[in-house]
Amino acid sequence: MAKAPITDKRKPAQNGLFSAEKLYLLRSSFARIDAQSEIAGLMFYQKLFTLEPSLQPLFHTSIDLQTRKLMNSLHYIVATIENPNLLTPALEAMGRRHVAYGVRKPHYELAIRALLETFGQILGDGFSPDIHEVWREALCFVAESMKNHRN
């Protein structure tokens, strides 16, 4: 999957979800997170399983494979977030798969929390309140789209 391009802050946003500035913050911060993708993925799962140990048995593949799947999903989300007509059906399909794995609606907030904590650790002082907020908005959009899948 292609890396998400860095958006010019001056270019107008093409949707109502995020301003061009927010897209820039999302994509530029993700580029820094992606540079440490293996660490970020492992850190995320460690945090998730610490928050809710009962989730660990839902994962039937190696943590390395899960990490790659997570980062590939984040790549796609970051690359397509300005096109909800493309992104939403993919998220709904992912939501259906996650239901089959045993994921329930309350688990999404735990995943958001674990991701935000992970991003904060990876980015350090670079995880500004604005970057935190844009990631929270993006992850909430992702979670809502996944939870609202059509059976």
Show where each model-derived region lies:
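Globin-like tetrapyrrole-binding proteins
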Residues: A2-N151
